[in-house]
Every structure is written in C-alpha cells, then in structure tokens.
Amino acid sequence: MKKILAISTKRTDAAEAMLAYLEGRMPQVQIDYAVYDDLVISFIDGKMRVSVENTGLDLADYDMVYFKSSVVHDITATYVQYALRNDVKVTDVAKGAYAGGSKLYTYGIIVPAGISVPNSLFAMPGRLVGAYDRYEQALGLPFVLKGIHASRGDVNEVIRSRDDFDRVVAVALTSDKKAYLIGQSFVPNEGDLRILVFGGEVQLVIHRQRADESTHLNNTSQGGRATIVPIEELPAEVIAASRSAATLSEIGIAGVDMVKDKETGKWYCFEVNEGPQMATGSYRQSKWNELAKYFMTELEK
C-alpha cells in the first residue's frame, strides 16, 4: 500500500473531509494527516530523522508528502529537502528553496553530507511545553536552547534544570523573536573559530573566546576576545568541513563557526552565517582586504 502524508498548519474538519474523500477514490493508498506541531526533527550521532509523532512513522517512510500549507519558510524547506533526499515525492518542490540564515535549514543540508553538528532536537513551539524530559534524554545535561533565526549570541541559553527549560520556553511562547528553538548538546570548549569562506575557499580565521566563565558565549558581540589564526594551523578536516558547509549552503561570503570539544577533541559546526559581520566586529580591515581580493578574483573570471 502506498502512503501519503498531508501536512498543514492546523487541523480542520474541511481538510479531514477532503482527505477522506481522496483516500476513498484511490484504492491501495493510505493518507495520513499531520500538522507541523506533530513533526520533530533530530540530529543525533550524525543521523537526521523527521519523526511524525501522531503516526509513529518517519517522514522518509512515506511515498509522497502533500504540503497543504506552509509554516515558517525555512522550517517547511527543511522538511521538503529531507523528503527529496529520501526519494519521497513532494507536491510542491519549490517549497524546498530557501535563502537566508537558519540553523535548522543549514543542519538539514550539511548533516546528511557528513558534517558533524552537536546532537540537536527541534520541535515547534506547541510541543515544547512539558518536553523537558525528552530533551534531557536526547541531549544530556547541560544542553542549550537557541533560536534558529538568532545571531550574535542572542537567544542562546544553557539549560541545567527543568526550571531553566520552562523559563526559556515560556519566553519563547510569548515572543516572535524566540518562538523557534533548537535544543543542542552543550559542547565544552576553549573558544570557537569564525572561518571566513569566500567563493568556497577559506580566506581568514578568527579565534573567539569568551571573556570569562560567567557566560558560554564566545561571540565578540557578547564581549569575547578575538585573535587571528594562520590558516595553515587549521586541521585539514576543519578546512574541508568549512568549505563544504559554505558550498552546500550556497553562501558565497560565509562565516562558518567551528568548535572543538575540549574533552573529546571532536570538531563540530555550529552554523554557517550569511552575514558574517563583514562591516563590524573584530579585525574589520583584515576582513575587508580579503573581501577586496575575492571581489577582484571574481571580476577577472
């Protein structure tokens, strides 16, 4: 039997009646109905899954997905891309196109390509209330809740207890800015690398480290210190992952944030920034010099 999943922003009697009629017209076809709140995305140990909670299946188990309506563009696009990669037919392929900064969409592109990110879990705001145990089980303690659209260290909280989780979620449910959160395993580190990749090539590397242990954020916008690191000092795996992440994200002027777990030595990609503080932040002239070289190279092609 073939299986179709219909997804909409909210469940309605009219939609259920339509889907029941369609199912009756198509022998050997099962149509399941879900809303976006029913979907949970996980990136665990290098594997991406999209769980359809109300059916018990993975999105990849379906033969076709009918996106009756869309939620926030990058979230819908993440589901579309996942379906297509798993040979699931999609009624609206155009919904898979997205250009903009989104941690969730970026992870959906780079994780299947073998680039490591910290274990992560994403659910719509409607599923967050009372979900602490699930996040703790999947990610361990402490973990981080961060906004998928946030930048410069904004909307980024360490969760050490149920009270922390409930507090951050309460804010998420009352603020558009913090409405869409991804949970992520905490990575102990001694700073991170902002790797500027222009045209698929690493051009400049800046090490950023938090000012003190009162915060977990290394961003210079949050008071972190910055130091230029010679490119030749980077491990080959970090250079390769940075180039690949920028290329897969189709961002010509990218800031790839890489971090090393100081306990395990493993490298992770935090995100790929489409606006990597070129006009502001640390070492502006160094960034501008590299940007000028890149522009000239492109113009001469």
Regions found by a protein language model. Give the residues of each.
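Protein kinase-like catalytic core scaffold
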Residues: 143, 203-204, 266-271
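ATP-binding N-terminal substructure of ATP-dependent carboxylate-amine bond-forming enzymes
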Residues: 1-90
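C-terminal active-site "lid" helix and adjoining low-complexity regulatory extension at the edge
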Residues: 230-233, 247-251, 260-301
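A short glycine-rich, hydrophobically flanked beta-strand micro-motif that places a catalytic Asp/Glu
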Residues: 184, 194, 251-262
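Short glycine-rich anion-binding loops that position phosphate/pyrophosphate groups of nucleotides
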Residues: 70-72, 148-150, 275
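Active-site nucleotide/adenylate-binding loops and adjacent lid/helix of ATP-dependent enzymes
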Residues: 2-8, 14, 20, 24, ...
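Phosphate-binding site of ATP-dependent enzymes
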Residues: 154-240, 245
